[in-house]
Curated annotation (Swiss-Prot):
Compositional bias annotation for Basic and acidic residues: 11-25, 46-80, 109-124, 148-158
Source organism per UniProt: Daucus carota
Family indicated by similarity: Belongs to the plant dehydrin family.
Protein name per its UniProtKB record: Phosphoprotein ECPP44
GO cellular component: cytosol; membrane
Keyword Zinc: no
Region (Disordered): 1-25, 46-131, 148-175
BP-aspect Gene Ontology terms: cold acclimation; response to abscisic acid; response to water deprivation
Induction: By stress compounds such as sucrose, sodium chloride, calcium chloride and abscisic acid in shoot apices.
Lineage: Eukaryota, Viridiplantae, Streptophyta, Embryophyta, Tracheophyta
Record keywords: Phosphoprotein, Stress response
Listed transmembrane segments: none
Post-translational modification remark: Phosphorylated in embryogenic and somatic embryos. Not phosphorylated in non-embryogenic cells.
PROSITE patterns attached to this UniProt entry: DEHYDRIN_1, DEHYDRIN_2
């Protein structure tokens, strides 16, 4: 029985050894694969680093400046923050405590305090202006005497009273040929000239009468000249006949024959 038990024990040990040796081989192969992948990855990274260009010094400076600007808050942002903080502090805040509302005291900002001080200074500097009525000027000795004289006070009153405005000149109706409402440019200019008086209907009638009388006189003068001419001609002929006896014979014969 003892020999039988020993045989299977040896067989079991052998199987375990083979299994362990097989596993060791597979594990070794797996490790080698891992090492190969690591080597390939490192080579690829080195190639990529070599192919990429090195960053320039100027580009680095620009990037640093932009980062600094972004980090530093601008003046407008600071003012906006200060204004928002002052407004939030000055605003009324209501807090409920046990169902009751209580208002916190207003915290005034710097701007409001400065404005209040300025207003106070302006109020202090403003001086109340008093309206002073000027007393009447002192009258001289002569003026007092004139007032006491009869008629002196009336003159003063007359001087103070303003004279009435002059009456408006009445519009002059001008008789114009054709439509009386329509006037020519020359007539309007003549009306504006000082000392010009537009012609009325009576003046025009007088002019017509004067023209007619002048025509009659001219006609009378023409007739008088005609008579004078004939008379002078006849007188001349008579004188010629008186002083020229040669013409007497034919005239006498002409008279007797007739």
């Amino acid at each position: 029985m003892a020999s039988d038990d020993s045989v299977p024990q040896h067989s079991v040990e052998k199987t375990t050894e083979y299994e362990s040796s097989d596993r060791g081989l597979f594990d070794f192969m797996k490790k080698e694969e891992k090492d190969e992948t690591k080597v390939i990855a490192t080579e690829f990274e080195e190639k990529v680093q070599v192919s990429e260009p090195e960053p320039k010094y100027e580009d680095c400076k620009v990037v640093e400046e932009e980062e600094e600007k972004a980090a530093k808050p601008s003046l407008l942002e600071k003012l906006h923050r200060s204004g928002s903080s002052s407004s939030s502090s000055s605003s009324d805040e209501e807090v409920e405590e046990g169902g009751e509302k209580k208002k916190k005291k207003e915290k005034k900002g710097l701007k409001e305090k400065i404005e209040e001080k300025i207003h106070h200074k302006e109020e202090d500097t403003s001086v109340p202006v008093e309206v002073v009525t000027e007393p009447e000027k002192k009258k001289g000795f002569m003026e007092k005497i004139k007032e006491k004289l009869p008629g002196g006070g009336k003159k003063v009153e007359e001087e103070t009273v303003a004279p009435p405005p002059p009456p408006a000149a009445a519009p002059v109706d001008c008789a114009v040929e054709g439509d009386p409402a329509k006037k020519g440019i020359l007539e309007k200019i003549k009306e504006k000239i000082p000392g010009y008086h537009p012609k009325t209907s009576t003046e025009e009638e007088k002019k017509d009468n004067d023209c007619a009388s002048a025509k009659l006189i001219i006609r009378c003068l023409d007739r008088m000249f005609d008579y004078y001419y004939y008379a002078s001609f006849s007188c001349g002929v008579g004188l010629i006949l008186c002083f020229d006896p040669l013409l007497w014979g034919p005239l006498i014969s002409f008279g007797t024959s007739g």
